[in-house]
Amino acid sequence: MTSGESKTSLKNAYPAAKKLLPKVEEEGEAEEYCTPGAFELERLFWKGSPQYTHVNEVWPKLYIGDEATALDRYGLQKAGFTHVLNAAHGRWNVDTGPDYYRDMAIEYHGVEADDLPTFDLSIFFYPAAAFIDAALRYEHSKILVHCAMGRSRSATLVLAYLMIHRNMTLVDAIRQVAKNRCVLPNRGFLKQLRELDKQLVQQRRGAQHRGEAGEKAGEKEP
């Protein structure tokens, strides 16, 4: 990855992000939105980018990559990465850890997960999203979220981040990621993302209704 490529992809990512965020905030769409089924969601991934390289920027300063990217310490340092989230942490997966990057200015977070439909990755959604969000608050930060292939576990955690901290629906999050990298979470992870989507949509609708009720109450006051 050259610095020129990074700058170009970064410039292209911002307009895309700006186009998506208002869509989630539109009241009409928020009321009508219904979480699609697994097959419909998979079709969104298939319609996405065929691009599948070692690492791709999917959101400003946020990258999804594979094991080779995570193990290339020189490449990470040269590209300016400051944070690494390993979604395949552990001895039998991508065995890096904080010690692997101890001589580098990299903050590490590990998630010990298996790429199996029966594995409950949802318990890591909020901690992983919090790590990503905290990393992106730094002006010059650059975070790599990876697993073994950069297609399922890492993509799932990035999607959860966009839903939790960027107020995206699952559909908008998939479109944002899939247009920049070829990814496809397994069916079990998709089911968990669907459940998260339903919860977040319900919370946002509840907050919207409470806000509307508060405004009406304020209007009635003399």
UniProtKB/Swiss-Prot annotation:
Q: For substrate, which residues are the binding ones?
A: H146, C147, A148, M149, G150, R151, S152, R153
Q: What is its EC number?
A: 3.1.3.16, 3.1.3.48
Reaction(s) catalysed by this chain's protein: O-phospho-L-tyrosyl-[protein] + H2O = L-tyrosyl-[protein] + phosphate; O-phospho-L-seryl-[protein] + H2O = L-seryl-[protein] + phosphate; O-phospho-L-threonyl-[protein] + H2O = L-threonyl-[protein] + phosphate
- UniProt feature, compositional bias: Basic and acidic residues: 209-222
Specify where the region named Disordered lies, as residue ranges. Answer: 201-222
Identify the residues that the record assigns to the Tyrosine-protein phosphatase domain, covering every copy: 54-202
Q: Where is the active site?
A: C147 (phosphocysteine intermediate)
Sorted keywords for this record are: Cytoplasm, Hydrolase, Nucleus, Protein phosphatase
Q: Which family does it belong to?
A: Belongs to the protein-tyrosine phosphatase family. Non-receptor class dual specificity subfamily.
Q: What is this protein called?
A: Dual specificity phosphatase 29
Q: Which gene encodes it?
A: DUSP29
